[in-house]
């Protein structure tokens, strides 16, 4: 059984991006710029934003964080986005989720210039993904990170049966569309399971590649997995654990110990898919920089 080490691959990728950023700094005197907007003071969101800013700094990319109070009107946020759309030094715009209830998340997504939508959530980018124009869009960072892991670990995908458990707009839907594309690291037959699927194990047991992204701790158990399957665990769930200092620990959507005994390869939680998400955000921002500057 092979452990797919997202921590290592994300660091490898960041090192590669750092080299590219240094090259552009030396050759044209410019570097990519990412701006993150956070509305309110959600502790988890603040941690995510700090991690993104730290990763930008690590590779020499310019990073700006705009903090807005929890009661910010929607129009104020939209105006800030419109200004960033016009700023030539900003190549990536990300609005940290979740947003306060007075703000329509879809309206915010629509306001971001698709050419700077490095989260890959704008309908134009999703539409290009569905149509197979991956060279003209941004792919959502978590699915893109999973694709990078499969590629770098030389996981055979062509003609394989990929089962995606979960249908969120952030992971499940773009992941399923990505895995059916005609790419070296995809080209699968794809099945999507969700909360209304009857007899989910009957589908997961057919999977050559099983991607769990439903947000339920240890939902996928050994009796739901085909021996030799590649298992990608997207879930991050807190469960109580009195033996730890914090009183909890992180587990995925997969019962790791039981499934690892059967799988040919598996991502751990933490240290699997999670680290790849920020790395792919940086990669998307660099790609935006290249496109905007015709590089």
UniProtKB/Swiss-Prot annotation:
Function, as annotated: Catalyzes the oxidation of 5,10-methylenetetrahydrofolate to 5,10-methenyltetrahydrofolate and then the hydrolysis of 5,10-methenyltetrahydrofolate to 10-formyltetrahydrofolate.
One matching Pfam family: THF_DHG_CYH
Keywords noted in UniProt: Amino-acid biosynthesis, Histidine biosynthesis, Hydrolase, Methionine biosynthesis, Multifunctional enzyme, NADP, One-carbon metabolism, Oxidoreductase, Purine biosynthesis
Gene name linked to the record: folD
Protein name (database record): Bifunctional protein FolD
The keyword Isomerase is annotated on this UniProt entry: no
Self-association and partners: Homodimer.
GO cellular component, one term: cytosol
Species per Swiss-Prot/TrEMBL record: Chlorobium phaeobacteroides (strain DSM 266 / SMG 266 / 2430)
GO molecular function: methenyltetrahydrofolate cyclohydrolase activity; methylenetetrahydrofolate dehydrogenase (NADP+) activity
